[in-house]
Amino acid sequence: MWLTFNQVARRRRPLAPRRRRWRRRYWXRRRRIPANRRGHRTNRVYRFRFVREFGQVLQKGTGGSQLSFGTDGINIILDDFLDWGTINWRLPFEDYRIRLAKVEMRPLNESWEEWKGFGHNVPIQDNHLEDFFKKTRLDADPLANWDGARKWDLRKGFKRLFKPRPQLSVTDTDAANVTAALWLNNPKSLWIPIMKKSDQNLPSSGTRVKHYGLAFSWPEPTPNQMDYQVKVTIYCEFRQMNLTHLATPK
């Protein structure tokens, strides 16, 4: 007797349900740090923010029909942000680097009806920045065609973020005329030692390394000059805390 497929399927013994196997979860064990590496480590980075404020004067123009321009710039030096005063104290770190800078410029009680105009601001990360310091009576805006230039309104001011770069080609402000390239223990990381061995001077040599910088231009206002408040904020990183730097080195 031949059976159909459906009849054969009914007569087959049903399979027992498969038992589910419960696997024990693997809990990642906490990695234990050796006793000699606990606490402060050499790769720990400390981040600080420093603020500096000062006044900026835009000198007035000649008042004729010919439009004239002025330019100026800002260099970043860590020592300018540290209020040393008369106290002989030092930073308790070995190295530092400036990761970011922010420049804010706002007018002080100026009449918006007297003068209207706009200039440009641009980060310049080499020695060409100093070519624009304290320049007046220019026939054209020298920063208008720079790569990265942004327009700013004289009535409102501006805010600009940029990454400062330490000087590498010209001599440092150190008395020994040490180039800033000698301060860098790794050209990629740009960590700058805060002071040299047996450094007795305050401020320390490392904090005087110059960082470039932001240049800005403006049409010279008429009939009066314009006063601005400039606020510079830098974001620094320090590493290798060393409390022995707080005392005068021998």
Curated annotation (Swiss-Prot):
GO cellular component terms listed in the entry, alphabetical order: host cell; host cell nucleus; T=1 icosahedral viral capsid
A GO BP entry: endocytosis involved in viral entry into host cell
MF terms (GO), sorted A to Z: DNA binding
Location(s), subcellular: Host nucleus; Virion
Keyword Transmembrane appears in the UniProt entry: no
Main location: host cell
Region of interest (DNA-binding), residue spans: 1-39
Gene3D superfamilies reported for this sequence: Circovirus capsid protein (2.60.120.950)
Keyword DNA-binding: yes
Tree of life domain: Viruses
Entry keywords, A to Z: Capsid protein, DNA-binding, Host nucleus, Host-virus interaction, T=1 icosahedral capsid protein, Viral attachment to host cell, Viral penetration into host cytoplasm, Viral penetration into host nucleus, Virion, Virus endocytosis by host, Virus entry into host cell
Pfam families, A to Z: Circo_capsid
Segments of this protein annotated with the region Nuclear localization signals: 9-42
InterPro entries referenced in this protein's UniProt entry, alphabetically: Circovirus_capsid, Circovirus_capsid_sf
Function: Self-assembles to form the virion icosahedral capsid with a T=1 symmetry. This very small capsid (17 - 22 nm in diameter) allows the virus to be very stable in the environment and resistant to some disinfectants, including detergents. Essential for the initial attachment to heparan sulfate moieties and chondroitin sulfate B of the host cell surface proteoglycans. After attachment, the virus is endocytosed and traffics to the nucleus. The capsid protein binds and transports the viral genome and Rep across the nuclear envelope.
Subunit structure, interactors included: Homomultimer. Assembles in the nucleus, presumably in an immature form, then migrates to the cytoplasm once assembled as mature virion. Interacts with Rep; this interaction relocates Rep into the nucleus.
Family under the similarity heading: Belongs to the circoviridae capsid protein family.
Protein name: Probable capsid protein
Source lineage: Viruses, Monodnaviria, Shotokuvirae, Cressdnaviricota, Arfiviricetes
Gene: Cap
